[in-house]
Amino acid sequence: MLPSQEASKLYHEHYMRNSRAIGVLWAIFTICFAIINVVVFIQPYWVGDSVSTPKPGYFGLFHYCVGSGLAGRELTCRGSFTDFSTIPSGAFKAAAFFVLLSMVLILGCITCFALFFFCNTATVYKICAWMQLLAALCLVLGCMIFPDGWDAETIRDMCGAKTGKYSLGDCSVRWAYILAIIGILNALILSFLAFVLGNRQTDLLQEELKQENKDFVGSTVSSVLRPGGDVSGWGVLPCPVAHTQGP
């Protein structure tokens, strides 16, 4: 084997080891993002009360709990995604839809992991990358639309008269909203990484095909040519010499 071929083989083996390790980490963080997505969709802790709010309570995308404002801290909870009429704002309904769509996309991406056993690796990476990018976009829309519903009467009763669209008044942002923003950054990074891995797999496949073609041509020529430079199967035939008789 030529030195260049040996170097190419070593590079290929080194890259494959690193690629598998990065791919495993990418898959693990994709599962983590899916868990984040499910949590922020279900949990009602997107915004909540503070020490200066008239009433205690907290709101999520579709589920919310609000107190009576009396000395007790008992909360009355309402809201269900299966019953849109219980969601206090149209903006909350739209935000819940986009976050749900993001969750479906990322769960579908995890399902696509099974395709690694049947399809081209580069193709699967690119499919997952697009799904992660769309999931991030849907989550961005959900986070941007959600504050548009802060002027709902139920939220104004809890957060005070200063509450309006994109203004929480006396209330504050809770951990689920912050976790959703972290999830957006996570999804964008995962999508970029999947595109890089997919394109690198495509380039590596092309390099392998070129190397195989070179090896095939080289082995064919080596098997045809003899060590002395003659072509095998085409030995030098003796040249007939005409003998003339003397007078």
Swiss-Prot record:
> Gene3D superfamilies per the record?
1.20.140.150
What membrane topology does the UniProt entry give?
Multi-pass membrane protein
Q: Which domain of life is it from?
A: Eukaryota
Q: Which InterPro entries match?
A: LHFPL
Task: List where the protein spans the membrane.
Answer: 22-42, 97-117, 127-147, 178-198
Q: Where in the cell is it found?
A: Cell projection, Dendrite; Postsynaptic cell membrane
- Pfam families (alphabetical): L_HMGIC_fpl (PF10242)
| Subunit and interaction comment | Interacts with GABA(A) receptor subunits. Interacts with GABRB3. Interacts with GABRA2. Interacts with GABRG2. Identified in a complex of 720 kDa composed of LHFPL4, NLGN2, GABRA1, GABRB2, GABRG2 and GABRB3. Interacts with GABRA1. Interacts with NLGN2; leading to mutual regulation of protein level and synaptic clustering.
Name used for this protein in its record? LHFPL tetraspan subfamily member 4 protein
A GO MF annotation of the entry reads: GABA receptor binding
Q: Which UniProt keywords apply?
A: Cell membrane, Cell projection, Membrane, Postsynaptic cell membrane, Synapse, Transmembrane, Transmembrane helix
What task does this protein carry out?
Plays a role in the regulation of inhibitory synapse formation and function by being involved in maintening gamma-aminobutyric acid receptors (GABAARs) clustering and their associated scaffold proteins at inhibitory synaptic sites. Acts in concert with NLGN2 to recruit or stabilize GABAARs.
Listed under GO biological process in this entry are: gamma-aminobutyric acid receptor clustering; neurotransmitter receptor localization to postsynaptic specialization membrane; regulation of inhibitory synapse assembly; sensory perception of sound
What does the similarity note say? Belongs to the LHFP family.
What's a GO cellular component annotated to this UniProt protein? plasma membrane
